[in-house]
């Protein structure tokens, strides 16, 4: 039968970070204790909605078409504190600010597809999606790349970019090798997000006056959307042009799955066909009506190793220096503001099944999965949960038939589910370990000099602090509630 489905996941993703101050970190941050430990901070636990709508239309016994609007199953918006209280109740700049303070956006993939039974019991499908994305991220950087600086030296940066064409292609097949066993395979390729936009800056945002009294009179705002980059200085006129100065590129991994499904019919296929024949109708398999239960095992792969970095670029000179000024201070926006990730491919195992308690009326289901870690400890971050994960889910479907004619397929289906994911901790607590440095507004730390477009004489990358800001322990937990409604006809 044909059907239209509307559903939404409600995602609660909780992330916490217990930062450790690097041994060579010379910044003056009163939040760190004598052992370099910062207070544990967590994101706000806010529900993120992930709605989906789709439909399939049966053209004939062999051909069907479908359309779908779906977003990635991710944690969505994240809000971290700009300021936290120390042991005396005094508000200070938050310890995770160099990694993330805000994350929000919209990524949607309208998709159309077609499926055809090319041979008896062999079905193939192909789909094409046209995605678009609007992304907002905020974090802190340091202005002067030097020692002995306080949070007064920090700049709050708010990046906003968009990409209105992200092509996606997927293909799959399903072979019913016996009346009780199906095997299937699926592959998906998605182009990288290649977004354009601008960045807004706020200097002196993390001062004690703003933290403790909300006094933002010293905050200097700028934005690369303006011709003078928002500095208000005549000498900067034209440096930011007409905007669109930020270029962001993020690879989206290829994915593939193979699976096998066993289903136990209530009656044999021959008997089901015999029962359908007197009514003059052909037999069409309906798992909720015809099966007692099913169980499925899937193996999954995601090419996350394609994500070496979140690539963030701004206009620069031929020598690698940033060309865009920051309002209120003597520094510039780095031409190369990439955020390293160096992910690994992810492999997973998923198992689940349905048990039809009431034929053609009520099904209960359960499943579980495990996936390997994508992230490496050296590059750990609080934006995406990239550690090993184990999860389970429970749910069910209740069908309400419309009309009393058994030959008709019209029905309403109500679906609900709950899932929980356990994440392994990401931990790197050696204060002498390497990690991800913060961005800086001047090229090299201390007395180091520029030796190349992206290097300083001390061997470090330009426009980066001399110390990492991601050391510590990151924990994650996720709960997902799913509700849906379908009409089949």
For each predicted feature, which ranges?
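N-terminal, post-signal peptide beta-strand-biased segments of exported outer-membrane/organellar beta-barrel
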Residues: 1-71, 385-388
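Outer-membrane beta-barrel porins/channels
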Residues: 48-489
């Amino acid at each position: 039968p044909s059907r239209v489905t509307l559903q939404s996941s409600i995602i609660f993703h909780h992330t916490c970070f217990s930062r450790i101050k690097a041994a060579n970190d010379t910044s003056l941050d009163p939040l760190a204790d004598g052992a370099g430990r910062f207070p544990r901070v967590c994101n706000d636990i806010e529900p993120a909605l992930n709605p989906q709508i789709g439909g399939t239309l049966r053209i004939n016994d062999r051909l069907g078409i479908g359309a779908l609007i779906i977003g990635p199953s991710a944690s969505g918006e994240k809000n971290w504190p700009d300021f936290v209280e120390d042991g005396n109740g005094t508000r200070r700049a938050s310890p995770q600010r160099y990694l993330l303070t805000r994350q929000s956006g919209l990524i949607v993939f309208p998709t159309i597809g077609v499926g055809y039974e090319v041979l008896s019991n062999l079905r193939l499908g192909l789909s094409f999606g046209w995605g678009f994305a609007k992304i907002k991220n905020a974090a802190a950087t340091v202005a002067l790349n030097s020692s002995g600086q306080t949070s007064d030296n920090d700049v709050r940066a708010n990046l906003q970019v968009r990409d209105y064409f992200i092509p996606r292609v997927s293909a799959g097949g399903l072979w019913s090798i016996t009346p009780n066993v199906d095997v299937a395979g699926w592959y998906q390729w998605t182009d990288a997000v290649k977004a354009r936009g601008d960045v807004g800056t706020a200097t002196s945002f993390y001062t004690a006056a703003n933290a403790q009294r909300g006094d933002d009179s010293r905050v200097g705002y700028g934005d690369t959307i303006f011709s003078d980059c928002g500095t208000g200085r005549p000498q900067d006129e034209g440096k930011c042009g007409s905007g669109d100065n930020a270029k962001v590129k993020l690879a989206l991994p290829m994915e593939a799955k193979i699976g096998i499904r066993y289903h136990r019919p209530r009656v044999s296929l021959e008997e089901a066909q015999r029962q359908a024949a007197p009514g003059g109708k052909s037999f069409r398999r309906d798992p909720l009506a015809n099966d007692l239960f099913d169980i499925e095992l899937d193996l999954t792969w995601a090419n996350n190793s394609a994500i070496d970095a979140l690539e963030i670029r701004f206009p620069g000179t031929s020598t690698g220096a940033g060309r865009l000024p920051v309002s209120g201070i003597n520094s510039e926006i780095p031409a190369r503001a990439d955020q390293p990730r160096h992910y690994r491919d992810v492999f997973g195992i998923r198992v689940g099944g349905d048990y039809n308690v009431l034929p053609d009326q009520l099904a209960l289901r359960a499943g579980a999965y495990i996936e390997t870690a994508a992230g490496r400890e050296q590059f750990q971050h609080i934006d995406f949960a990239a550690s090993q994960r184990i999860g389970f889910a429970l749910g069910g479907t209740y069908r309400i038939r419309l009309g009393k004619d058994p030959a008709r397929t019209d029905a309403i289906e109500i679906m609900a589910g709950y899932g929980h994911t356990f994440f392994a901790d990401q931990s790197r607590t050696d204060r002498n370990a390497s990690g991800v440095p913060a961005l800086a507004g001047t090229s090299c730390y201390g007395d180091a000099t520029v030796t190349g477009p992206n290097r300083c004489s001390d061997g470090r990358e330009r426009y980066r602090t001399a110390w990492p800001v991601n050391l510590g322990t990151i924990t994650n937990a996720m709960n997902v509630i799913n509700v849906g409604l379908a009409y089949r006809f």
